[in-house]
Amino acid sequence: IIGALLLIYLGVFCYLNLYKYAQHVDSDIAAEALLAREIWTEKDIAPDDWISSTERRIIGMPTVASVFYGMTGSMQTAVGITCILLGAVFLGTFYYFLRKLSLGRPAAITALLVLCALPANGWRNEGQMVPFVTLLLFLFAEYYVFHGIFLFFGILFYLKLREERKLTKKGLLSWLVLFVVAVLLNCGGQRCLQVVILPLVVTEVIALFLESGHLREKLPGGRYLATGYLGSLVVAFLISCLYGGRGDYAVYLLNPKEAVEKLLITVPAAILENFGLAGNAKVGSFDSLIQLFLWAFLILLGYGIWYIFRKRSDVSDQEKRTVGILLTSVGVTAFIIGITSAEAAHYYFFMTWFAAAVIVAVLVEHLTGKQSAFAALI
């Protein structure tokens, strides 16, 4: 049943990408298609005559779509094919990521369905609701699909270095590829630094502090391979600063009163809205029913976090570290937005979707057989 529901979602995504692009297009979405055409016409990944509002990306959906535009001559068809292709690669990467964490197939497929079906917010067009998660990962624009793919491979490589504490030729090649991708992603903005690199660095600093007995004990040399890898990602960001691909717009630190109010009220509200809890639904209506289900789902996530990080837990260290990294990413984003004048847009917290999907997968994996009825309910 879970697999069938997932296929239905994927079929809907394919249909929307190929046949409903014009119905849901806006200025931001149209700009992605126009950029794809411009890249092909000028034969330049970052055309000089293209004026970017916030960033000049080197890799992104338009980069791939430009190839299909050259083949088809249609911006709409090119974007549709590209979004289907990249969405499939993204879901395949996420599935591979979950399986490498030793999660079973039912748990992994459930997580994929959660990622496709969970967010209930978005914008309406002719009575149809298009959740923002689909715009970010599956439909029309796919702004953060490359960040998601890089995140999953980056976490897996980090965990591998922490556990094996040695570097093979294959590992060195993987390191080099991830470093190059980090440079390219960072050239287009600070999102990669914010949602991938900084959370990994924070996680590593805390881990080193605890493993070294509060800096009193010396750790084996191989343990610092993971630290070196994260250091190289920071270097990748510094190298990308030479490119100058970010928009020159000012962000200011808030005064303490404003920062506390934003951290305690605005940011949590944005995270809740990110899941679809927007309010303004008449009690008894379908919208109110969906939002009640979302509240129940958030309670489930709270239980999942407790289950994963409790002292007597049968959850593996890999699974704990992965959930910890994803939650840290949400925390880093919340902190940066909370203390600055940056807009607290709900879709900036898209990492909560990944964290939620992994938490559900872990619960399904470990409760199946022990609490089969509860696992089936999830």
Report residues per predicted region.
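Short hydrophobic/aromatic helix or loop-helix immediately within or flanking a transmembrane segment
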Residues: 31-37, 51-74, 266-279
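Membrane-interface micro-motifs in multi-pass membrane enzymes
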Residues: 25, 58, 105-162, 342-356, ...
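Membrane-interface alpha helices of multi-pass inner-membrane proteins
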Residues: 171-191, 196, 201, 231
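Hydrophobic/aromatic-rich transmembrane helices and adjacent perimembrane loops
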Residues: 142-144, 194-195, 293-299, 303, ...
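Membrane-interface helix-loop-helix junctions at transmembrane boundaries of multi-pass membrane enzymes
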Residues: 166-171, 208-226, 300-329, 340
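Membrane-proximal lumenal/periplasmic loop motifs of glycosylation machinery
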Residues: 18-27, 40-63, 77
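Transmembrane-helix motifs of polytopic, lipid-linked glycan transferases
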Residues: 3, 81-110, 153, 302-307
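Signature aromatic-anchored transmembrane alpha helix within multi-pass, membrane-resident enzymes
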Residues: 1-7, 171-180, 226, 230, ...
